[in-house]
A protein has these predicted regions:
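Condensing-enzyme catalytic core of the thiolase-fold
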Residues: 2-475
């Protein structure tokens, strides 16, 4: 085995990508939706558990639209050379995530089904839903079934025990049959170990939950694996599976949902966010290794910063990211913003930009701002991953991509004095600074409990990923 000397400053190349979000089965499809300024959000069907417009248990609005994966979620095992059928009580998220990993590796010309060797690679994955088909099925067979029978005995004290046992048997028959495999694959550590095994990655495989920052946390760990020499290739990704009513109801106690049909980031009077579904994976290598292997490079990761910004300096994490990358802040030409549609969070975001860029001066640098959430909704744990896909393609194609145009843009970003401008139309990404390549920053925020009285400049937990173009003379 070749010994690698740690280099904590080396650029990390994105050499493969995959994604599946509402109406977008690939990075190319997502890019097309972005460039067309098209919302892929869909209205919940007639079988939706909670009728549109009805209030939920927290007396909050239920979203009238949601980023539905629909058929893009159905990744059958035959697509993965899996030898048997999927049990109805198994965790379908596993096969969806495995297919995303396969798609990313195929994009990087690392076809897992065509090689026998194992790569010296790690898998870092953001995923932790409160419910999945496997865990719910086991609860139904155990605690829920016992509770149901106790309720029946309480309200029908004279019912013959034999009749009650017959009811119990019928209830069991109506449920998917449980098995040890489905139970174990419903747990996080077996979930990510499965992906590593199927993709022939022999290194560390971990699953994590950092809320909306999960995609960034997965990238952070993968980058450290490569820079420390613990891996020669890394798979990093995040997933938000189809959202259940139970999850949405719980989330509504903390998050302001929009009742508008579309999410248009950075509106003057936003009504809230729209939840989305989906996931993405990235294949990462050290740049020197990617060049040696003649890989296509979408973009370079220069730094990843995650942490809590204090109330008096909400821009601290952004500053940390640029300091780690060793670059001046004003050389960043694109901010793929959080743009959640939640007023306090967007105000905090624009306040960070104002603090760092200041007022515009003639001849001074400008930074374009936009968000992919208008296209696919707020994909929660996968939100940062979606932003990285968009920003990486923007760097590859040298285009400043648009977002959905707000009816009334937020004044703090739409005013002439601002050094930031909202990207409501696509623009060629022209730079006259030969000393600095094109750079983008992807921002993400965790939700704070909804508080209409919160201060604009309040701190919070956030993530910033700095991306850079691969030099033009190499392409």
């Amino acid at each position: 085995m070749v010994q690698y000397n740690a280099n904590m400053d080396c650029p990390i190349a994105i050499v493969g990508m995959s994604c599946r979000f509402a109406g977008c089965g690939s990075p190319a499809a997502l890019w097309n939706a972005v460039m067309a300024k098209k919302s892929m959000l869909t209205v919940p069907g007639a079988d939706a558990e909670l009728p549109i417009g009805q209030r939920n248990v927290f007396n909050g609005p239920y979203p009238t639209r949601i980023g539905q994966l629909d058929k893009l979620y159905s990744c059958v095992p035959s697509m993965q050379h899996f030898p048997r059928q999927v049990n109805a009580g198994e965790n379908q998220d596993l096969y969806f995530a495995t297919q995303l990993a396969f798609d990313a590796l195929n994009d990087a010309e690392m076809h897992p089904n065509r090689v026998k060797k194992h790569w010296r690679g790690s898998v870092r994955f953001g995923y932790a839903p409160p419910f999945n088909a496997s865990t719910v099925n086991w609860l139904q067979h155990t605690a829920f079934l016992d509770q149901t029978m106790d309720i029946l005995r309480r309200f029908m004290p004279k019912a013959p025990e034999a009749k009650l046992e017959e009811v119990r048997s019928k209830l069991v028959e109506s449920l998917p049959a449980p098995n040890a495999s489905s139970f174990l694959l419903g747990s996080g550590f077996r979930f990510v170990s499965w992906i590593a095994r199927e993709c022939k990655f022999a290194g560390a495989a971990t699953i994590m939950d950092a809320g909306n920052l999960s995609g960034g946390a997965a990238i952070l760990d993968a980058v450290e694996d490569l820079r420390c020499g613990n891996a020669d290739v890394a798979l990093a990704g995040a997933l938000t599976p189809p959202l259940s009513r139970a999850y949405l109801e719980g989330l509504s106690s903390e998050v302001q949902f929009s009742t508008n049909p579309e999410l248009r980031s950075f509106e003057e009077n936003p009504s809230g966010t729209i939840p989305g579904e989906g996931g993405a994976f990235f294949v990462l290598k050290r740049r020197e290794d990617a060049l040696r292997d003649h890989d296509r490079i979408y973009a370079l990761i220069r730094s990843v910063a995650i942490g809590h910004s204090p109330d008096d300096d909400p821009s601290a994490i952004f500053t940390m990211a640029t300091e780690q990358a060793g670059i001046p802040i004003r050389t960043i030409g694109l901010i793929e913003a959080d743009g959640s549609g939640i007023a306090q969070m967007e105000a905090r975001e624009t306040d960070i930009i104002r603090r760092l860029w200041g007022e515009h001066k003639p001849g001074g640098p400008l930074v374009g701002v936009g968000s992919v959430k208008g296209n696919i909704g707020h994909t929660l744990k996968a939100a940062i991953s979606a932003g990285i896909v968009k920003a990486a393609l923007a760097l590859k194609y040298r285009v400043l991509p648009p977002q959905l145009t707000p009816d009334a843009p937020l004044k703090s970003i739409a005013c002439p004095e601002s050094s930031a401008y909202l990207l409501t139309e696509a623009r060629p990404w022209i730079t006259g600074d030969s000393a600095n390549p094109r750079r983008a920053a992807v921002m993400g925020f965790n939700f704070d409990p909804f508080n209409p009285e919160a201060e604009t400049s309040r701190g919070g937990r956030s993530a910033v990923i700095v991306l850079e173009e691969e030099p033009e003379d190499r392409l």
